[in-house]
Amino acid sequence: MMRMDGQAQRPKVLRRIITAGMLASCLAVAAGSQNFKDPTEGVRPDADFQIARIMYATNARAGSRGIAQPMWAVDYPGAEEHFLAALRRYTNVDTAEDTRHLALTDERLFQYPYIWIQQPGYWYPTEKEVAALREYLLRGGFLMLDDFHGRDWGEFENAISRVFPDRELMDIPKDDPAMQIFFDIDQRTQIPGDRHLRYGGQVQMEGPPEWKGIYDDDHRLMVIANYNMDIGDAWEHADDPGYPLPMTAFAYQLGINYVLYALTH
């Protein structure tokens, strides 16, 4: 079972020490990550917490390290391997060592409190998927969206507005519980993708970072959208000496906060 051992109540100074320690151990976390099983296997989660990455129909492909995958699978499996290793290292959450890939219409969806859509600029959900996601979120689920930039916003906004036509995408304030539950996220540093750091700087970020969210009637955060950021890349490249460790550490902090919020709200 998930235990936080009072860490959410620790003073800011101590949490800053934890943050500094995270910088020193990012590579150790990456080196200690596990090999994944077939992500479509299994009827139930393997532990109290297991990430479910959402599959969606797309012909577009992208990736790094010479591997091109469907847009929903970009950064797999390195992102999950490294992040789940960090989650196990810094919390007492009972965390599975593998992940799941599910369609929104999969009946197993409701067994996973935290789901992830990567590259939502290429996400065009069907009516059945829209209905399933709305029900999932209103029944207590949590959705993170990551790695979309610039003009991707319009496609994402069209999709998410079909899920919640009556709810506004709002700026997530720094004092939101999701930003303070474990680490105090009082900075808004932009997390670049690997492609933004290579090629002689020719690939530029397409705007400032934005944290957008959708809340339910009790002001529970159901959706977090990391716009003009690439948290998945920061996780994936934790073992890459060419990717800045401070960015990976910050991405770990965000992800850990999101997970703990999803499990406790």
Q: At which residue positions do the language-model features occur?
A:
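Bacterial N-terminal signal peptides
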Residues: 17-28
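Aromatic-Pro/Gly-enriched surface loop or interdomain linker
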Residues: 32-114, 120-121, 222, 230-265
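Short alpha-beta junction capping motif
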Residues: 51, 109, 114-155
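Surface-exposed patches in mature extracellular/periplasmic domains of secreted proteins
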Residues: 92-103, 145-149, 167-175
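A generic secondary-structure signal for well-formed alpha-helical elements
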Residues: 91, 141, 163-167, 262
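N-terminal secretory signal peptides that target proteins for export/translocation
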Residues: 1-14
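An acidic, glycine-rich "communication" segment
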Residues: 59-65, 150-237, 252, 256
